[in-house]
């Protein structure tokens, strides 16, 4: 017979049989070799077919191995191994059966049919282990499903649904799906579409994370529980794995064959199977090559006729981008819009999921944590959607507590490290024999004994707490498994067994859980001394703070005191601007105490004043105060935005322009660091159109970038600086602050539009600096020089006369404090640099600076 008439799987099995014969030094390929090779190939399906026919497959494999060991061996046989006469006869019989059935190719199961009638060793073993001809023939008919084998890969296309889909209803039966809370309207609308005569294919469209896949899981749970109309009862809901369909399709037409096999299996089911395709937009263009059809086009006829009950899910953007472009595909689906749930609905969803997450992590999730997760995620995580972002917070906070439970508590870890340190020291001191060393050794021994006792006490408490926690955890898991069993019994209608579990075993387990939890409470004088086992609102706030950089968690006492004394801290670097410092400090205190308007930035200020009086310095100081670093200061020099088109640099270029994908400078910075100080320096130099962009930022705390994404500015402090009104401030230096402010505001109104000024929280006028202020600034500047000298192991002492001389040299009422820096460089740093290079000051020396004859003198 011709071997090219065998199917691909049969040819592979024959090749494997040849390898078996070679490995065993057998001169011929016997029927036993071929049958064992078929059983060893898990993908061939022969093992499953024989199991269906009632054959004990493991015992058969063991018998075949023994039979092969008894076959004659030929050492050093270098010739080609050929098919034995017995196997050739069996293959010819299989060929005859194939002709009778009208098959173009000989499939593996026909060899089994021939073998079941054979009287040789392999046939005898098959019968011995339960394989009679009638049962094997019945199993073959069931697997073939009345179809002919007309392609070499026909065996690979069998049971396509099993290979390329996952049964969601089966997972629901096993209790592996999360409970679906709410979403009744969307599920009802999907059922309504599924019951139509034609085009009965709903597609769920919504933003990422709103719960589209959860709706399908909810439908699977309702089908399992029988909470659906009669026409949907007992149906299967399968998830199509498109990646598995495409994976390994090497030749043209292979992907199409697989998809056709899936569609054929579905059509055989007479509408008893619903298919769910997640990310349905991937169908468009899937498997398309030159001249080939893509998956979307192959599905269209079945979708239109109503043969294929398909549920799709995709996001709004991808639906518009892929599905809407293909009008023929779009009309075959009915849209079901899935909106973002409200905060209240999200809280209900989280309460439903609470038990699953508690069992998974082995921690308790409190109700305040659930409320905090919904509210904080809605307020601070603006670029994602509920309920996904709230679930993420709960999951991460619980994961953090679980990680702490699995590792050694911090208090014990510190003691452990200290003990190791002392033991090393003891070994070193032990080698010394003098009296001082012996005294030190005695002290070390005493400390080690004391710390060891403390460590042992803590370890005992830790073990007790951990044991209590693990005990209650195992009971919770048992209760969860029991509830799944009860649901299954309820579906089967086994009321007697259900009553036994519900009124017998379940109350016992709940009583044990209550006992374990109450015992834990009594046994601990200080509850949770070492282990945190609860996720509270504070833990959720910590996760939000870590993810966004926004301080959401409760203020510690130290931070409260720091905020109350904020003016003093700012005055350490900003001299003589009391009104400005107070305005900024009040804005920060409002935000941290929770009184600030949540829909606006923390504060928006316009700083007006002459050059060099501390406008920019105050912003830098504020950033350092809030974040302990200047990195969170987003500084934009508005002199770079003098042209009309430069607005695009702030928010990103519009579609069609170069740089569209890159995003805007301001919007990208704020997206990465939502909690920051934004400094718009020299704001009057920008083009008037730039201010139009800032209007919505100042009013609503939001800005839409070039790509249509909304960027949240609600956690920023916006400061604009300008030199407008400098001349009036200089001229009216001695007048009252309010009089100066009115005069400056008159000039501001000529420069900026009323709607822009009206949106700014406070316009702050900075005073010009007098000689006393300059002297204070000189001290601050010299402090910086002292720090630089300290790195060189030098110290600096400057007399009051020398300081006055420097201040006088650096005082210029027009230019503010900037000339002072230049004066310090020229009068102090330059001569000092020469002296250091000349070797005048060795390490640990003190540089004395005094005033002599109107000049600075070094000693």
UniProtKB/Swiss-Prot annotation:
GO terms for molecular function: ATP binding; ATP hydrolysis activity. Its main location: cytoplasm. Residues 769-859 are annotated as: C-terminal. Residues 83-146 are annotated as: Repeat 2. Residues 391-525 form a coiled coil. It comes from the Bacteria. Belongs to the ClpA/ClpB family. This is Chaperone protein ClpB. It comes from Chromobacterium violaceum (strain ATCC 12472 / DSM 30191 / JCM 1249 / CCUG 213 / NBRC 12614 / NCIMB 9131 / NCTC 9757 / MK).
